[in-house]
Structure formats: C-alpha cells, structure tokens
C-alpha cells in the first residue's frame, strides 16, 4: 500500500515538472516576437532622425564687381560748358582712377567739327545741333539746361529791358541808354565770336541772326563778363551760371532768369547744354557709356545743380 502511494506521488511530481517545463518554453517563445516587433519600430524611427538633420543652404554666389575702366575720354567744344565739364570730369576720374578725361574749350562749332572728324569722343555744344551736323552722324544728348543772362556794367540804372528793345540794341537800332529810360550814355554792345554756341543760341532766340552790330566780339564767356564789368555803358550776354556781383543782370520783360522761370517757360533766353556723340549712346565704347551713366546718376545730378544749371525734365 505504501509503495502505491509513493508511486502515485512520484507520478504527480513528474507531471508537475512536465507542465512547468512547457510553461517556461511557451513563455520564452512568446517573448521572442516582442523583441522582433521592436526592431521595425527602431527602423521606423530612423527616417525621423534623418529628417531632423539640419539643412545646409548654399549661399548665393557673390556678384562679380564691374570691370575697372581704363583709358581716355576726350571732349571738346563750348566754352560756356567749362564749369560743368571741369566739375564732372574731376568727380568722374575720382570714381574711375583708370580713366583720364581731357576737355578742350574751342567753341561749340569747333567741337562738333572735331567730333565729326573723329578726333574727340564727345562734342560739347551750348545750343541745339543743326541739321547739317545731324546729317554727319552727330547725335544730340542734352545733359543740362542753361539760361543766358543779359548783363550790364554795374553803374547802369536800367534793370529791365523788353525782348523787342534788346533785339533793337543788338541790331544797332537803339544805341543810347536814355532811350531805355537810363542815363544819356552810349551802349557798348559786347558779344561772342562767330561759331560760339552762346552767340548762336542768343541770336536765334532773339531772332537777330546775322543782323547784330557788335562793338567787340570775344572768344570766351569769361572774357565777355570781364569786359562788360570794366566798360561803362556796356551790355553783353553770358551763361547764367557765371554771373557774379561784378555786373548786374537785366530782367527781360520783367522776368528774372531763375530755374523756376526757365522750367516754366517764362524766360525767353534758355538753351540746352549738349554732349554730342557720333551715333547713339548704345553704340559707344564702355568709357563713353560710363560717362553718360555718371551724368545721369545722383552724383552727376548734384554736380549739374551745383554749377548753377538745370536738370532736363
């Protein structure tokens, strides 16, 4: 009997051992898939790590600086444009140290002839181009507007003159200041030499072309200013920007030669300052193009105003 009980207990123990072993095996097998399932999760996280990487943007390539200009630029012509040309060329050469600008003041006609002959790059004229000059290939580039001032010797008592009387003075039909309300004093008529842009513009605007009777014909704006200042009874015409306190400026028909009056079209004696080229600006070399670009820049406009001229509208 005792042997049967022992045998039964041994059997129960063996069954329990077998069941425990099976349970452990199943537990191990069940844990394995969890590990395998974790792997894809790690793999799925990888793209997030890649997306989180900082994006390095490429910097835009730096613009290449404009090529430095080297060479010469030759201008010639109007003496009235001296102040403008001197100020503009000095500033331009400071901005472009590789360029040398030369200017000869020979008068508008001579400057345009030199341009047509190909001996200069730009012909300066203080008047509009004539048809014959345009037919030679010269192109009119207006860079500024100038007023022509009528001046008299400082002791003169006349301060205003009509356009009609002014024309008569230059044609010799009025020869004494008393006929204009002034003192009994002969009028000494001073003007520019033939070929001068100032003379051409004055005579054309006053409609006295080839009809003037001059006491003296001088070859520069400065010479006219000095002669009128030192000659009792003298009258002359000069570029507005050179008028100083050595002379008096006359009103014409009651209108003073100011920028406002000129732009409004009220002042009769105004003319363009032209820098003519052979062909259009688009056909010029790089230095000539740079010169005109500079004139049209804010710096160039300030220079135009500083020398007493008006920027074209």
Region annotations inferred by a language model:
Residues 11-13:
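Repetitive helical segments and hydrophobic/amphipathic motifs
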Residues 17-21:
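C-terminal motif of bacterial Sec signal peptides marking the signal peptidase cleavage site
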